[in-house]
């Protein structure tokens, strides 16, 4: 789960990380009012979407008068902001962050991720923060310094100071940098985050260290114990199909292809997509119905897939272990009738009650294309999707 920058800064404040004063707003008039309340000669008008690269995309503007605040808020609010992370379709801006300006002397970068090899949280930092940090990672990786943190001790003072020194924080500002690094680590740990970034972390002209941006991703499997994080969820920023799928406990991710996939088990789902691509097809989605799929869940899965206007065929690939093939067959038949299925449907099922499931499909009267192996199923659905079946 992702959250907005201003929400990330609310979390950082709770953990003692210095951030600029700012106010989230949803209208142009509120943007001007927020700037008036903040005071000062300079404000930053920032688009709030769940994607990076906003500055390069025109979603961050520095205003030097209230008239400019109004002008920029009017430009950004409601725009379809395109960045390298949104894709060509962009993301609509529904809210802004109006923030006090800052005296930027130097832009740094700090980020935390989980390293699955060492099974530790890794703190990354660079002296080259700002809009081009991805380019720094690609072209000059030696400028990115890392520390794998022992979970028994947390980020120690000496480790924080060493990292801050390596990225150019002067000695006089080390206590501030230490507090920010340790605060970010604690925030990451205590909220069950999977990613946390401050980019840029700035040094000001008078030696202050401030988090000018904040990005958090959270482990969705841990949200049950973080209602305060769930409260930050913005459904407008999420794929509507994925939101709908989550209501029925379906693991669904939209993709760019034209072949719908309904599979039980994440591993089999990924193998199914790989096999489709092997035979020249393009999956339209990842969809894991899990081990406890009901007729209702299968029907809803079909409805969600069929909302994709690019869909030209569907492959159902089931291994009946916990999941019984006859239950899936019943769901497929009911779903096909409920949605008046008009695209080719290929079904491959193996395992518990396999023969019964196949018999039910064969006697359903529906034009279902049967397959015995995953390779055969993939070949048939690719052919069907291209009109060659």
From Swiss-Prot:
One of its GO terms (molecular function) is succinate-CoA ligase (GDP-forming) activity. It catalyses: succinate + ATP + CoA = succinyl-CoA + ADP + phosphate; GTP + succinate + CoA = succinyl-CoA + GDP + phosphate. GO terms for biological process: succinyl-CoA metabolic process; tricarboxylic acid cycle. Its cofactor is Mg(2+). Residues 9-244 form the ATP-grasp domain. Pathway: Carbohydrate metabolism; tricarboxylic acid cycle; succinate from succinyl-CoA (ligase route): step 1/1. Mg(2+) binds at residues 199, 213. Keywords: ATP-binding, Ligase, Magnesium, Metal-binding, Nucleotide-binding, Tricarboxylic acid cycle. It is an enzyme of class 6 (ligase). Belongs to the succinate/malate CoA ligase beta subunit family. Succinyl-CoA synthetase functions in the citric acid cycle (TCA), coupling the hydrolysis of succinyl-CoA to the synthesis of either ATP or GTP and thus represents the only step of substrate-level phosphorylation in the TCA. The beta subunit provides nucleotide specificity of the enzyme and binds the substrate succinate, while the binding sites for coenzyme A and phosphate are found in the alpha subunit. Heterotetramer of two alpha and two beta subunits. This is Succinate--CoA ligase [ADP-forming] subunit beta. It comes from Paraburkholderia xenovorans (strain LB400).
């Amino acid at each position: 789960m992702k959250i907005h920058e201003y929400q990330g800064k609310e979390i950082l404040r709770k953990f003692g990380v210095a951030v600029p004063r700012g106010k989230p707003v949803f209208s142009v008039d509120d943007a001007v009012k927020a700037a008036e309340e903040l005071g000062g000669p300079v404000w930053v008008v920032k688009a709030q979407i769940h994607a990076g690269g906003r500055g390069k995309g025109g979603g961050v503007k520095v205003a030097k008068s209230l008239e400019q605040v109004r002008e920029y808020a009017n430009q950004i609010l409601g725009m379809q902001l395109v960045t390298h992370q949104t894709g060509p379709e962009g993301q609509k801006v529904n809210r802004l962050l109006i923030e006090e300006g800052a005296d930027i002397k130097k832009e740094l970068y700090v980020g935390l991720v989980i390293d699955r090899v060492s099974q530790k949280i890794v703190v990354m930092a660079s002296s080259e923060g700002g809009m081009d940090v991805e380019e720094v990672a690609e072209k000059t990786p030696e400028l990115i310094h890392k520390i794998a943190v022992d979970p028994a001790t947390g980020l120690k003072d000496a480790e924080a100071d060493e990292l801050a020194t390596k990225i150019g924080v002067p000695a006089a500002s080390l206590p501030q940098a230490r507090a920010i690094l340790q605060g970010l680590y604690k925030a990451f740990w205590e909220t069950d985050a999977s990613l946390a970034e401050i980019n840029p972390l700035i040094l000001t002209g008078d030696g202050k260290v401030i988090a000018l941006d904040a990005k958090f991703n959270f482990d969705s499997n841990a949200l049950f114990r973080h209602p305060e994080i769930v409260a930050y969820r913005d459904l407008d920023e999420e794929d509507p199909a994925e939101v709908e799928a989550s209501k029925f406990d379906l693991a669904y991710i939209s993709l760019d292809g034209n072949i719908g996939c309904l599979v039980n088990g994440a591993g089999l789902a990924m193998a199914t997509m790989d096999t489709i691509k092997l035979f020249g097809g393009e999956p339209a989605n990842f969809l894991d119905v899990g081990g406890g799929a009901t007729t209702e869940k299968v029907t809803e899965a079909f409805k969600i897939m069929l909302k994709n206007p690019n869909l030209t065929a569907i492959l159902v690939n089931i291994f009946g272990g916990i999941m019984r093939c006859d239950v899936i067959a019943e769901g497929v038949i009911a779903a096909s009738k409920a949605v008046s299925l008009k695209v080719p449907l290929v079904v491959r099922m193996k395992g518990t009650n396999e023969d019964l499931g196949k018999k039910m499909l064969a006697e359903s009267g529906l034009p279902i294309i049967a397959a015995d192996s995953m390779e055969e199923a993939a070949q048939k659905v690719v052919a069907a999707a291209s009109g060659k079946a």
